Amino acid sequence: MKNRMNGAYIIRFLCLALFLLPIIPAGASVLPDDEQTETTKELIAFPGAEGFGRNTTGGRGGKVYHVTTLEDGLQEGTLRYALSQEGARTVVFDVAGTIFLDKRLDITNGDLTIAGQSAPGQGVCIARYPVTINADNVIVRYLRFRVGNEGGGEPDGLGSTDCRNLIIDHCSISWSVDEC
């Protein structure tokens, strides 16, 4: 008699579990918010990112643009083309060397990651004219900026104005001729 009662309880439990299982949405957290791990609350930009910009998402989850030429222009495959696009995007480099800008480069569309570490060999250098970031949510990594004095004036090699969530990581900025 006791075995029948235990069996009946087990069957009832299984039926109840099978009935309730579809009601719980997939991916639903069973932990209250205050018990969730720090990882689920705060996703950092990249391993080792620190400081106020560490949660910048850049182009995460967006389109990937490949820089396939060192030329400066608005044709597909150039850095300028990739930076002029809108929406979340990551720029990777299939070439290494120096991109000699024909004019200043203004980054005005945010949600952007420029992954200089993706370049082969010695990486990428941006030269001749300044680069200015005027957009939110931008990550720039592993690039060299060498503006020099070819373009005239006293430019900064890399600058930013009126932007939030900006990370400049492992970049070298030199040969600027401003405010000496």
Task: Name each model feature, range by range.
Residues 35, 44-91:
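Acidic Gly/Asp/Thr-rich repetitive segments characteristic of extracellular carbohydrate-active
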Residues 71-72, 96-98, 118-121:
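Acidic glycine-/aspartate-rich tracts in secreted/extracellular proteins
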Residues 13-23:
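Bacterial N-terminal signal peptides
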Residues 79-87, 99-115, 122-141, 147-164:
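Extracellular beta-strand-rich solenoid/capping regions of secreted or surface-exposed proteins
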Residues 2-14:
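Bacterial N-terminal signal peptides that target proteins for export
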Residues 26-28, 32:
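Boundary at the C-terminal end of the N-terminal hydrophobic targeting segment
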